[in-house]
Regions:
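C-terminal substrate-binding/active-site "lid" region of AdoMet-derived donor-dependent transferases
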Residues: 1
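Class I (Rossmann-like) S-adenosyl-L-methionine-dependent methyltransferase catalytic domain
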Residues: 4-5, 9-22
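Polar/charged low-complexity regulatory segments
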Residues: 28-154
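Phosphate/pyrophosphate-recognition segments in soluble nucleotide-handling domains
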Residues: 20-30
Length: 154
């Protein structure tokens, strides 16, 4: 005998379970401003929010923005990150405004690391809500990423 399933359950197809996880991608909601913090950099005048998550064999964590001589290691276009020791540079992220026809009318994102820890960089356009992620697997040295098609202008 086949088990009886109410019509609502069959028609739902368990989408009610999956939808809360998919909703941020289907309906990200209105864009929100970038808010600078220990684990958040705001580049190009706050247009782009940058965050880093790291992973090791024994755990996970959030990258922190470095400081050099008490000054935050963040300019308008770039930021340096540490994972474990505030004096040990792990990686850098740069976002450039290439919004001219000769350069393709795009914002560019560059990611480079000096670690074999796994990491994921998340860059969010606070004007549109668009998100790009760049990842490096645990145990591998990262190749520099140069994404010259990252976000549309303006």
């Amino acid at each position: 005998l086949r088990p009886y399933f109410p019509l609502e359950r069959v028609r739902d197809g368990a989408f009610a379970v999956a939808f809360p996880h998919l909703r941020p991608y289907l309906d990200p909601g209105p864009p929100t401003p970038c808010v600078r913090g220990d684990a958040t950099a705001c580049l190009l005048g706050g247009r782009f929010e940058v965050k880093v998550a790291w992973r090791t064999d024994t755990g996970t964590g959030t990258g922190k923005v470095m400081s050099f001589g008490g000054a935050r290691a963040e300019s308008n276009e770039s930021v340096f990150w540490y994972f474990f020791n505030p004096e040990n540079f792990e990686m850098g992220v740069k976002v450039l405004d290439a919004c001219v026809p000769a350069l393709g009318n795009r914002f560019w994102v560059f990611v480079s690391g000096l670690t074999n820890q796994g990491f994921t960089v998340t860059v969010r356009d606070s004007a549109t809500g668009a998100v790009r992620t760049y990842s490096n697997p645990l145990g591998f040295y990262p190749q520099t990423v140069g994404d010259t098609n990252a976000f549309p202008c303006p």
